[in-house]
Amino acid sequence: MTLEELENSLPNGFHDAEIQRICIDYQQRIMTIDMAVFVGDVDAPLEKREAYREGTLVISGLQFATIEPPDARYPFSTPGASRIDACDMTKNLDPSLLQALPEGSFVRSFFVDDWNAFLHIAGLRAEIQWKTAVTYRNDREHCLPGETVDL
């Protein structure tokens, strides 16, 4: 499965997922990303809306992983998880690098909100290994258009 296919199998893709840890094993060509995936439904009742599930994203057959430096104007050094969203940024990558990838490779990028920068990944297979059941947070971060929010 490609990273985009995995993303499409999730209720919200990787939108508002939170990266907690990244590990790369170059000998085994495996990248693991511990994350909390937003699996909530914005149309759900408030107490069920902020639903997250923790898991480990496993990229096997890792071809490359590139982390862009953060924008200095963003809170990149604040401890804690980093919120992401997945996207296609192949237009920003070297075409000769993309052509050199083995057949069957995928390339996908994560935009890291706290950095205003990207994490680019190329690999052969992607899967998520769930570590927890769905948990519900009390913080309101996902609102419907026109919804009144008490501050």
Please report, for each region that a protein language model flagged, where it lies by residue.
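Surface-exposed, interaction-prone regions used to assemble/regulate multi-protein complexes
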Residues: 1-151
